[in-house]
Amino acid sequence: MITVDFGNRIRELRTKTGLSQEKFALKIGMDRTYYASVESGRRNISLINIEKIADGLGVSLNELFAFNKENDND
């Protein structure tokens, strides 16, 4: 599921920064519980918030969406 794949990707990138969910959410101006639900794949996210996450992580949108989709055959 794309929301889970996206959540796993942003978790991977966030942990590389050394920031907790709370500190990262604060950095990008997002509520921690909302961010946590996106990272866990339980919530859809708007394009505006995707851009905030990419900017906060210092990556391009292409890099943000560079997760492995080989198991998705539908």
Which residues does each predicted region cover?
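Conserved hydrophobic/aromatic packing and binding residues within compact polymer-binding modules
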Residues: I10, F24-A25, Y35-V38, L64
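Recognition helix of helix-turn-helix/homeodomain-like DNA-binding domains
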Residues: M30-R43
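Short, charged recognition helix plus adjacent turn
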Residues: E63-D74
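Helix-turn-helix DNA-binding elements, focusing on the entry/boundary residues of the two helices
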Residues: I10, Q21, R32, L47-I50
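DNA major-groove recognition helix of helix-turn-helix/homeodomain DNA-binding modules
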Residues: N49-E63
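Short basic helix-loop element that most often maps to the first helix and adjoining turn
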Residues: N8-K27
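Short, conserved catalytic or interaction motifs in soluble domains
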Residues: S40, V59, K69
